């Protein structure tokens, strides 16, 4: 199913649909992006409280439209955007994390050359895209380990 919803969000119908059904929609995306994660309602509800912020829908929709060049970015950050488009090498110590759910990108080789400092990549099996909640120990260990680099 991939990222189909980014195209839905590009439409006025997507904006209205997400605004009306943001909790159900988010739960669906959680299940799609992390199919093996058996989260309970309490876990979802803790995050879902943020969906009721008055600017939540506008921020989400703008983000997806901006990714598709359908909405402008913040002009005050244009200089940073230009620098990022050059794909600068990252010199700080880094640990990247992927999951076996990421398919060909899971092993990190596609972007490893972007790092010139001490670098390692960890592939976690059996999780989706919410590493901090699905694999909190492994995530925390990566933070601790990179601090020691």
Protein language model annotation of sequence segments:
Residues 1-123, 144, 149:
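Flexible "cap/lid" subdomain of the alpha/beta-hydrolase fold that forms the substrate-access gate
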Residues 127-140:
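Catalytic histidine-centered segment of alpha/beta-hydrolase-like enzymes
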């Amino acid at each position: 199913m991939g990222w189909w919803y980014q195209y839905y969000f590009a439409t006025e119908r997507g904006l209205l649909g997400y605004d009306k059904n943001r909790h159900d929609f988010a739960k669906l995306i959680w299940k799609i992006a992390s199919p093996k994660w058996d989260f309970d309602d309490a876990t979802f509800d803790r995050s879902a409280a943020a969906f009721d912020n008055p600017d939540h829908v506008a921020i989400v929709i703008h983000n997806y439209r901006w990714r598709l060049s359908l909405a402008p970015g913040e002009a005050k950050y244009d200089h940073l955007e230009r620098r990022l488009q050059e794909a600068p090498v990252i010199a700080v110590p880094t640990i990247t994390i992927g999951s076996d759910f990421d398919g060909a990108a899971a092993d990190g080789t596609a972007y490893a050359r972007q790092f010139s400092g001490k670098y390692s990549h960890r592939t976690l099996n059996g999780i989706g895209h919410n590493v901090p909640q699905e694999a909190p120990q492994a995530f925390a260990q990566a933070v601790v380990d990179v601090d020691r680099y």
